From Swiss-Prot:
<feature type="compositionally biased region" description="Basic residues">
    <location>
        <begin position="148"/>
        <end position="163"/>
    </location>
</feature>
<protein>
    <recommendedName>
        <fullName>Putative uncharacterized protein encoded by LINC00242</fullName>
    </recommendedName>
</protein>
<feature type="compositionally biased region" description="Low complexity">
    <location>
        <begin position="188"/>
        <end position="199"/>
    </location>
</feature>
<feature type="compositionally biased region" description="Basic residues">
    <location>
        <begin position="119"/>
        <end position="137"/>
    </location>
</feature>
<feature type="region of interest" description="Disordered">
    <location>
        <begin position="95"/>
        <end position="205"/>
    </location>
</feature>
Length: 205
């Protein structure tokens, strides 16, 4: 790679100082707090067997949580640590569980790294029980409260392109049925710029 001062450049950029990428140096220490963790494999009574892994510095901030041993019925014979990545006020965040190591990979039988909660919390409004009567907000089957709705796309892009700007867009059937003048459409379509001052004058009179 050519050194920076020999690289071709336009004259203007030469005035601006290009910040150098700072490489991590061993001289500059990392003052973030660390947990030094070593994982010990245990038998099912909880007595340590075999070799402890070398202590790994895991940067530990107050916002993170910490590593918490889980003893679940499924695997008594291995230590599992849960790495809690939670909000700062100590609520339950996403819990990742690695098995016997600080890696956040899921055990082979499961596709997500989430530790299962005994009572799954219900998700609001996403999909209701199939027999339930109210479907969630956005679906087609949820009938609108008022029988005839004003259609949002009352004019297409093509119709807009053909017309001049100061003609009002075609008024939907509902609006035209309640006899409103094109100048005073209260809802749905804004009156066009040419008609607005006129209608205002009429209203003043």
């Amino acid at each position: 790679m050519m050194p920076r001062h020999l690289l071709p450049h336009s004259g203007i950029t030469s005035l601006r100082r290009v910040p150098r990428r700072r490489l991590p140096s061993r001289r500059r220490e990392d003052f973030r707090r660390c947990l030094f963790l070593s994982f010990v494999s245990t038998d099912k009574d909880g007595d340590p067997t075999g070799q402890a892994s070398p202590a790994v510095p895991v940067p530990h901030f107050t916002t993170w949580g910490s590593l918490i041993p889980i003893d679940s019925q499924r695997n008594k014979e291995r230590t599992r640590f849960t790495w809690m990545d939670g909000p700062p006020h100590g609520g339950l965040g996403t819990r990742f569980s690695g098995r016997g190591s600080a890696s956040l990979t899921a055990p082979p039988g499961r596709c997500f790294t989430r530790e299962r909660h005994p009572v799954p919390r219900q998700r609001k409004c996403r999909r209701q029980h199939s027999t339930g009567r109210k479907p969630h907000c956005g679906t087609r089957s949820a009938a609108p409260r008022n029988p005839k709705s004003i259609h949002k796309r009352s004019f297409s892009a093509k119709s807009l392109k053909n017309k001049t700007r100061n003609e009002s867009p075609p008024v939907s059937a509902l609006v035209s049925r309640t006899k409103t003048q094109p100048g005073q459409l209260h809802f749905c379509c804004q009156p066009s710029s040419s008609q607005a001052p006129a209608s205002r004058r009429a209203k003043g009179r």
